[in-house]
From Swiss-Prot:
A cellular-component GO term for this protein: mitochondrial inner membrane
Listed name of the protein: NADH-ubiquinone oxidoreductase chain 2
Organism: Pteropus pumilus
GO molecular function: NADH dehydrogenase (ubiquinone) activity
Localisation per UniProt entry: Mitochondrion inner membrane
Catalytic reactions of this protein: a ubiquinone + NADH + 5 H(+)(in) = a ubiquinol + NAD(+) + 4 H(+)(out)
Length: 347
């Protein structure tokens, strides 16, 4: 892709998200979503092949349907209340439809089917944008309407997402699909706490984006897309492979790594609100995610796949690509937990 064209497209993607996050008028929010969707499709099709075309088509159809539901919710709200303001409370029916539209855009269960398929059909840089940046706009809308969301609907979507995110990743060997199912589970955790403490949702989103960005950048650096190729990186880059495995365990929520902090805070917040059954179910289902990350760690670090003696010596040679930019990301992705007492200052 021409660098100038790519710059224009990326600018449009960012502008679309910024319009959604800052607009106070529902029509402008819808325009921002459409700008973002139409600009991100060429990024998904950057490596032109049948799989990326199929993935882009699935993404377009899902997002277009969600945008249509958004406009339906806005129109119904206009009929009920006669106003277009994002900051004013939505009517109950409009709020339910809007929640479903945003769930479809985020890939929450039961609207999650497109996420693993699209993530698998595109390149790693495109997958990074899909699973991080593309979550910002829908989450900003959910944050703004959090006071009027139907709590039962939200909890149902959340529990389903955490469960499906765990079950779906169990039999996967493709790392992009594993990251997609992990994304579904993380979105479930974020939406659970949305009605109780919306600010905590934003903190959770920031940590999720940090962990996912670090993991994808390390995959790109090592050109890794499957569990088999991940096991071979141990011979070439042992330090980077160790960092990948630690970041993945952090994504799974294993203490004392950074990924444990948002889960801990969400469970604490739910129990403060006299909710015991829900966090117990969430904690049990989070073990499914942790299990497939632990299995990945085991197969990579504690077992050696068949390889020649020449392959085992590759770590001795200098690696051409620079890894300087990864150092702060890896540190943040694994060592935020000791800083968590400072978050008490935010309350």
């Amino acid at each position: 892709m021409n660098p100038l064209v790519f710059t224009v497209i990326m600018s449009t993607v960012m502008l679309g998200t910024a319009i959604v996050a800052t607009s106070s008028h529902w029509l402008m929010a819808w325009i921002g979503f459409e700008m973002n969707m139409l600009a991100v499709i060429p990024i998904l099709m950057k490596k032109y092949n049948p799989r990326s075309m199929e993935a882009s088509t699935k993404y377009f159809l899902t997002q277009a349907t969600a945008s249509m539901l958004l406009m339906l919710a806005v129109t119904m709200n206009l009929v009920y209340s006669g106003q277009w303001s994002v900051t004013k409370p939505l009517s109950p029916t409009a709020s339910t439809i809007m929640t479903l539209a945003m769930a479809m855009k985020l890939g929450l269960s039961p609207f999650h089917f497109w996420v693993p398929e699209v993530a698998q059909g595109i390149s790693l840089p495109s997958g990074l944008i899909l699973l991080t940046w593309q979550k910002l706009a829908p989450m900003s809308i959910l944050y703004q309407i959090s006071s009027t969301i139907n709590l039962d609907l939200l909890m149902t979507l959340s529990i389903l997402s955490i469960g499906i995110g765990g079950w779906g990743g169990l039999n996967q060997t493709q790392l992009r699909k594993i990251m997609a199912y992990s994304s579904i589970a993380h979105m479930g955790w974020m939406t659970t706490i949305l009605a109780y403490n919306p600010t905590m949702t934003l903190l959770n989103l920031a940590i999720y984006i940090l962990l996912t960005t670090t993991t994808f950048m390390m995959f790109m650096l090592s050109s890794t897309t499957t569990t088999l190729s991940l096991s071979h990186t141990w011979n070439k880059m042992p330090l980077l492979t160790t960092a990948i495995l630690l970041t993945m365990l952090s994504l799974g929520g294993l203490p004392p790594l950074s990924g444990f902090m948002p889960k801990w805070m969400i469970i604490q917040e739910l129990t403060k609100n006299d909710n015991v059954i829900l966090p117990t179910m969430m904690a049990v289902m989070a073990l499914l995610n942790l299990y497939f990350y632990m299995r990945l760690t085991y197969s990579t670090s504690l077992t050696m796949f068949p390889s020649t003696n020449n392959m085992k010596m590759k770590w001795q040679f200098n690696y051409a690509k620079s890894t300087t930019h990864l150092s702060p990301l890896i540190i943040l992705s694994t060592l935020i937990l000791p800083l968590s007492p400072m978050l008490a200052l935010l309350e």
